[in-house]
């Protein structure tokens, strides 16, 4: 039995209920296979430390994930805003560059063949160590990513909200949201491991 859905925003409740039910069915199938000594039908498993949902409000579609990290907000803030540290947990071996840690600053990697910017994120808001907001630059769809850092139980709750899916074709939207929800979960696990000095669960990055 899993409860607590009444605490979610009303517009997110149903979207959380449906995938949670399917997730528990898969988890039970894994338990059954493990007890029987058989191969797990869903080897990727599920991470209880992560919390997230997708929501639609005022025609704005977003994915949201969060994780608790045993470190102060200042430490987590550096991990998500310092290009050298981003490289360590996001894309080991691929150097990130930041023009300036200020509104309008650009965070990006260089195309190894042409030298052009790739995966550019433009800083929209910076409020250390509480909130960090970026927007993807053209030619990418203008998604806005918000990082919120909250003190919790002597550590930090890091929450990522990725919005802008309403700009995508309707037939692609939910599939992209599902894939990105999984991807942001992986990303948060890597941040958690990096900050706490653990082995990265996804050492190849993203």
Predicted regions: what is each one?
Residues 1-26, 137-186:
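Beta-strand/loop substructures that line and gate deep hydrophobic ligand-binding cavities in soluble
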Residues 24-27, 31, 76-80, 86, ...:
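Hydrophobic pocket/interface hotspot
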Residues 33-57, 193-206:
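Short, highly charged C-terminal tails/helix-capping segments
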Residues 66-70, 108-110, 122, 148:
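Generic structural detector for well-ordered beta-strands
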Residues 96-137:
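Glycine-rich portal/gate segments that line the openings of hydrophobic small-molecule binding cavities
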């Amino acid at each position: 039995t899993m409860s607590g859905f009444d605490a979610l925003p009303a517009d997110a409740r149903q979207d959380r209920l449906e995938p949670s039910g399917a997730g528990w069915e898969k988890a039970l199938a894994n338990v059954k296979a493990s007890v029987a000594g058989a191969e797990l039908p869903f080897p990727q498993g599920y991470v209880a430390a992560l919390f997230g949902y997708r929501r639609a409000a005022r025609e704005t579609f977003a994915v949201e994930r969060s994780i608790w990290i045993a470190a102060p907000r200042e430490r987590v803030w550096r991990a998500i805003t310092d290009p050298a540290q981003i490289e360590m947990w996001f894309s080991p071996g691929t150097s990130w560059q930041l023009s300036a840690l200020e509104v309008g600053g650009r965070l990006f990697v260089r195309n190894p063949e042409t030298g052009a910017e790739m995966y550019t994120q433009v800083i929209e808001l910076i409020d250390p160590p509480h909130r960090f907001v970026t927007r993807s630059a053209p030619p990418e769809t203008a998604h806005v990513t918000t990082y919120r850092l909250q003190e919790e139980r002597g550590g930090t709750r890091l929450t990522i909200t990725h919005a802008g899916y309403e700009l995508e074709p309707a037939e692609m939207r939910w599939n992209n949201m599902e894939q990105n929800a999984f991807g942001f979960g992986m990303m948060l696990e890597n941040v958690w491991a990096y900050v706490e000095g653990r082995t990265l669960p996804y050492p190849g990055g993203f």
